[in-house]
């Protein structure tokens, strides 16, 4: 994977491994090597299941060791504004985090398939602001087999577009 990450600048690749064999580490290693070798800007880790996302977020944070560079965007993230009593610092932190969530302006973005699809296909302004972040990015899609059959055509069109144009 290290060599593939260095040699391949773009494309769509499939990694099949049994559960528990290290797909998260392997795909992350490929992505990091590709980012370093080809001046990519971001790594997106996308999965359909919150439980998988939360589990792999912990693995990715432990592997990368600096969670300041990692943005988690899903429905189980609770804002510190909701739990912090210091209103002034809470408002500033909330605004900064909300900006990152609205823009996905972070080196590593961990999110759900729902957020990914909304960014690609919805016309809401926050989704449009995120879309350009895919340019020069590495997209890792975990559990892709969980996609409903009725979205596969559009999903494949978008993936082909993104792999050749972006």
Regions found by a protein language model. Give the residues of each.
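N-terminal helicase ATP-binding lobe
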Residues: 1-166
């Amino acid at each position: 994977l290290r060599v593939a990450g260095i040699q391949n600048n773009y494309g769509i690749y499939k990694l099949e491994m049994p559960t528990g064999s290290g797909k998260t580490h392997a795909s992350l290693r490929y992505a990091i090597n590709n980012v370093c070798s080809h001046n990519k800007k971001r790594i997106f880790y996308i999965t359909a299941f919150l439980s998988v996302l939360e589990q792999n977020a912990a693995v990715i944070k432990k592997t990368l060791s600096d969670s300041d560079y990692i943005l988690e965007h899903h429905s189980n993230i609770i804002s510190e504004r909701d739990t912090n009593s210091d209103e002034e610092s809470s408002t500033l932190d909330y605004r900064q985090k909300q900006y990152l969530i609205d823009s996905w302006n972070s080196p590593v973005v961990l999110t759900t398939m729902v957020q990914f699809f909304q960014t690609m296909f919805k016309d809401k302004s926050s989704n449009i602001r995120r879309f350009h972040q895919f340019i020069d990015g590495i997209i890792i899609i975990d559990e892709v087999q969980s996609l409903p059959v009725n979205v596969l055509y559009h999903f494949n069109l978008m993936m082909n577009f993104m792999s050749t144009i972006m």
